Amino acid sequence: NIYLEFEAGEDVTEHMNKAERRQLRQSFEAGVEVVLEPTKEQIVEWYGLLKRLYRRIHRPLPSVDVFLKLNELNIGRVFVVVYNDRVVSGSAILCKLGNSQLFYDWYRASVEDVIDGVYPSVVSTWQAMQLVSDMGGGIFDFMGAGLRNKEYGVRKFKLTFGGELTSEYRYRKYLIV
């Protein structure tokens, strides 16, 4: 896992590397918007991105109903990133469960096509981190970082936002014959 700690009201861009800060600025200049309270239709559209991703990587995915309820149950946040009236990214964050100061970067998906000057994954990652700061600070857990000795693009991307690799684990499937 990769942890990054934020104070309340902190500018989280200070933790990001120069390239990601530039991509964030370019995305907003191009007209990207973050919708912190998305409509049901926007969440369903984002879920379509998630579903395609999880089908491709062969991982289980909860029902869309889980994400539709997340904001109203007050245990997490779902937000989307919109560009030209199209949902291009989004995230589901679990917030301070129990007495914990941890925020979990639970699910994220972005469009796979390239849009000139727009970096949906950078925007949704930044917004997830900003929510931690806006909600009083705490520790942002990027979650999965793969195995250290194996090349893993997702880990490389997450580390550009700062943070510290704290642990590694990987589930393994064993067949019992």
What are these regions (language model features)?
Residues 115-130:
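Conserved acetyl-CoA-binding loop-helix of GNAT-fold acetyltransferases
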